[in-house]
């Protein structure tokens, strides 16, 4: 070790001779070592020391993690007293109002560099051969203040004199051995747990542990400093333990949760361990300081946690790792149970830099890497149905193109206490895009929110990722009328945007579009084949589906065009919030596309049947735990299981009755007349896949309405390769039979039923050569693209029929 320390001495700058500030101590990953001036735990920090007998002003200095003085972060106009200290919080904030919050983070996964500049020269830096950190919450610094000898500090001392005891990175202790792994057990059982030292533990090593969620400290050790600890666990207990030894570094603790759940485990269980003061302390606690929407900006703090996820009783956790949490939401911060976000990062644990688990295999199969996720309390729906947002998003996103937040129910324990049931949700920010778009990180992302300032509804835009230039240019573009669909397509994915609008308007979500909307796009740095235009991430639709007694007759389309008629419901329908949509709908092609989507969705899945199917899935998953959750929070209307069933049934009835009203709202707004009943394949229920006006139906039966004189274009294929659609039979207001797998007609002024006619055979016309194939009509491939040069053996569409060149 002495040889290493001598080498470090020769590699570092001779700062003492220059009589300037020096880098004295750093921490590459600050979990809970020190809190900053805004009551956060900064990601990392650098301590500067003034070794002189006179005060030094920081304004003459810059600091960076790169040897580039011009781009280095300028320190503020502050004085460091003689032989004094100052902490620079390296959290990538770099804002003037944050004073000592630099615009970079220290590297934790590999060698770390820090440069201190004055007069355009490097006056101090870290030793050149520094390796990656041995563990979080371990500091690296000079043995004593300003000394030339560097090493890992046995005790971190941010803002104070260095401890005088250092060692090499390899002098780090191993984790204690748990004789039993954490698990979920029945209430009437017990666990005999032994904690012991690892095989390579040095002489003098001992075990410290806690059962209250805190990170254990040497002061938690029993007087005899035990080498083994035996615990008989008979109630839900969280154990955090680590090894300590004089002259050695201790990593963060290992944690195991022993959950004695009083019911059959039907949904995943999360166990979170953290210091109780991080939640309930009046000055720094997340729960104690997040009880209103105003706290979102004041107390949006993060706190360190260990988090485990269990998916089956008697089995080990799916993951068990360090992370951070914060409170999520606006008005919902006032709920008795808070929504919480959980973050993974390599600086907590290089081996677990993500939550690597397939949370939603039934909804988003194959998505396994998450930077963060939330446990949501239902938002505005907390004291009512609890699942409105999940029901709405899942119903629609299961059938159409949407960027959305998948959902499952879960139980939460914190420090061994049952907190109730929340919903596991994907995020509605850049982390959603990272998970769903193969790790895409080069984004522009803007969140639109509503604020009431001086009793005036405000439309706020927060640029969370990337730049603002493209978005501002987009606003300039759409603020002017007269653009075509093709022009809008250059700026925004019109198809996806209209899906989002149709969903929110059908379900009566009035907390949108002037709130709860996120625009994103791959920016110019992104390496992707995607168009670099905006899409929307769906979030927080819980104001829909009859929340607060809003009837299914409520006219969201009229609210869009006449917000002054709805003074109690128009906060999200200000002019800045609705200009984009209203100007888009002035284009005939976009308007027709929107009307088609609404009408076709309602006859397919956006109705009582489709919504009810989602409700049944969620109810079946959550019901047993929902009853216990209800008992914990004791809301007045929750008297029995039947009361809960009634709430779910009320939501089904709302959705069942909504289409009739929404069809009429559409007809009234755009003078389309009275909608007429239209069914497709309802009587025969043939096993076919049907496309209606370029919208592929999810169900093989369409049961909805349509408007007089609007074009109906249908195509269909059978799932049986030995059969094909050979024609269509129309009955009702008109009675006619049409040949071919494709049908185009106008909706008559009356009700009609359309049934596909199924014939034997593939339905593919065989043509002898390519010249004959081209002779009698334009060719298209199966995706609808024109084909000029057909290839032998491939199937094409000609005059609505499948053909193949032999």
Regions found by a protein language model. Name each.
Residues 272, 295-453:
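Conserved ATP-binding subdomain of kinase catalytic cores across diverse folds
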Residues 15, 720, 762-806:
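C-terminal outer-membrane/trafficking sorting elements
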Residues 22, 79, 88, 135-313, ...:
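Short, compositionally stereotyped local motifs that mark structural "simplifiers"
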Residues 158-170, 268-269, 277-300, 305-306, ...:
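Middle-to-C-terminal accessory/interaction subdomains
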Residues 18-192, 196, 202-205, 242, ...:
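Intrinsically disordered, low-complexity linkers and terminal tails enriched in Ser/Thr/Pro/Gly
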Residues 1-20:
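Bacterial Sec-dependent N-terminal signal peptides
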Residues 55-57, 124-127, 148-154, 221, ...:
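Short, surface-exposed terminal/edge motifs of secreted or surface/virion proteins that either
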């Amino acid at each position: 070790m002495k040889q290493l320390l001598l080498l470090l001495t020769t590699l570092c700058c001779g700062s003492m001779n220059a009589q300037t500030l020096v880098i004295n101590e750093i921490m590459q990953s600050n979990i809970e070592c020190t809190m900053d001036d805004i009551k956060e735990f900064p990601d990392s920090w650098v301590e500067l020391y003034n070794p002189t007998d006179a005060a030094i002003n920081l304004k003459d200095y810059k600091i960076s993690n790169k040897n580039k003085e011009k781009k280095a972060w300028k320190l503020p106009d502050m004085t460091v007293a003689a032989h004094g200290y100052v902490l620079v919080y390296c959290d990538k904030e770099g804002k003037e109002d944050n004073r000592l919050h630099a615009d970079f983070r220290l590297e934790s996964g590999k060698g770390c560099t820090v440069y201190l500049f004055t007069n355009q020269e490097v006056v101090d830096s870290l030793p050149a051969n520094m390796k990656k950190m041995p563990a979080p919450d371990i500091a690296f610094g000079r043995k004593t203040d300003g000394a030339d000898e560097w090493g890992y500090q046995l005790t971190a001392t941010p803002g104070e004199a260095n401890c005088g005891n250092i060692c090499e990175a390899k002098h780090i202790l191993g984790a204690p051995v748990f004789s039993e792994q954490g698990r979920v057990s029945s209430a009437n059982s017990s666990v005999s747990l032994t904690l012991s030292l690892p095989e390579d533990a040095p002489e003098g090593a001992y075990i410290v542990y806690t059962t209250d969620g805190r990170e254990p400290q040497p002061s938690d050790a029993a007087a005899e400093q035990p080498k083994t600890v035996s615990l008989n666990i008979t109630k839900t207990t969280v154990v955090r333990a680590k090894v300590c030894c004089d002259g050695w570094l201790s990593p963060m603790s290992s944690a195991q949760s022993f959950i004695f759940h009083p019911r059959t485990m039907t949904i995943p269980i999360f166990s979170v361990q953290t210091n109780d003061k991080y939640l309930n302390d009046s000055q720094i606690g997340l729960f104690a300081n997040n009880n209103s929407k105003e706290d979102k900006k004041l107390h949006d703090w993060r706190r360190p946690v260990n988090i485990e996820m269990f998916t089956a009783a008697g089995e080990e956790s799916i993951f068990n790792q360090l992370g951070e949490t914060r409170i999520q939401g606006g008005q919902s911060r006032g709920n008795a149970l808070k929504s919480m976000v959980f973050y993974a990062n390599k600086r907590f644990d290089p081996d677990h830099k993500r939550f690597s688990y397939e949370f939603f295999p039934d909804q988003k199969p194959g998505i396994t890497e998450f930077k963060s996720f939330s446990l949501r309390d239902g938002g505005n729906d907390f004291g009512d149905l609890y699942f409105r947002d999940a029901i709405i998003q899942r119903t629609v996103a299961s059938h159409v193109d949407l960027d959305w937040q998948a959902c499952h129910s879960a139980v939460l324990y914190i420090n061994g206490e049952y907190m109730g049931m929340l919903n596991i949700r994907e995020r509605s920010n850049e982390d959603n895009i990272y998970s769903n778009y193969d790790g895409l990180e080069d984004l522009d992302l803007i969140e639109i929110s509503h604020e009431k300032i001086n009793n005036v509804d405000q439309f706020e835009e927060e640029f969370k990722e990337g730049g603002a230039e493209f978005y501002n240019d987009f606003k300039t573009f759409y603020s002017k009328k007269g653009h075509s669909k093709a022009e809008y397509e250059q700026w925004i994915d019109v198809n996806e945007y209209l899906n989002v609008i149709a969903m929110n308007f059908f379900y009566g979500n009035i907390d949108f579009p002037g709130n709860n909307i996120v625009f994103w796009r791959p920016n110019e740095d992104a390496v992707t084949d995607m168009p670099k235009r905006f899409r929307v991430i769906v979030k927080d639709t819980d104001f829909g589906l009859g929340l607060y007694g809003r009837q299914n007759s409520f006219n969201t389309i009229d609210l869009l065009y006449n917000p002054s008629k709805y003074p109690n419901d128009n906060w999200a329908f200000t002019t800045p919030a609705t200009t984009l949509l209203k100007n888009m709908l002035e284009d005939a092609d976009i308007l027709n596309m929107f009307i088609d989507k609404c009408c076709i969705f309602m006859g397919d899945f956006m109705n009582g049947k489709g919504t009810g199917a989602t409700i049944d899935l969620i109810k079946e998953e959550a019901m047993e735990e929902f009853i216990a959750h209800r008992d914990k929070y004791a809301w007045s209307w929750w008297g029995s299981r039947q009361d809960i069933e009634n709430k779910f049934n009320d939501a089904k009835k709302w959705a069942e009755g909504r289409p009739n009203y929404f069809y009429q709202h559409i007809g009234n707004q755009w003078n389309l007349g009275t909608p007429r009943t239209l069914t497709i394949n309802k009587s025969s229920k043939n096993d076919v896949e049907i496309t209606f006006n370029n919208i592929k139906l999810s169900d093989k039966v369409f049961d909805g309405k349509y408007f007089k004189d609007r074009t109906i274009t249908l195509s269909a294929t059978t799932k049986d390769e030995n059969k094909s659609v050979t024609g269509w039979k129309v009955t009702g207001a008109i009675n006619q039979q049409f040949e071919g797998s494709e049908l185009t007609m106008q909706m008559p002024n009356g009700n009609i039923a359309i049934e596909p006619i199924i014939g034997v055979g593939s339905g593919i016309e065989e043509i002898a050569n390519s010249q004959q194939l081209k002779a009698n009509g334009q060719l298209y491939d199966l995706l609808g693209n024109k084909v000029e040069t057909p290839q032998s053996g491939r199937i094409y569409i000609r005059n609505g029929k499948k053909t193949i060149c032999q």
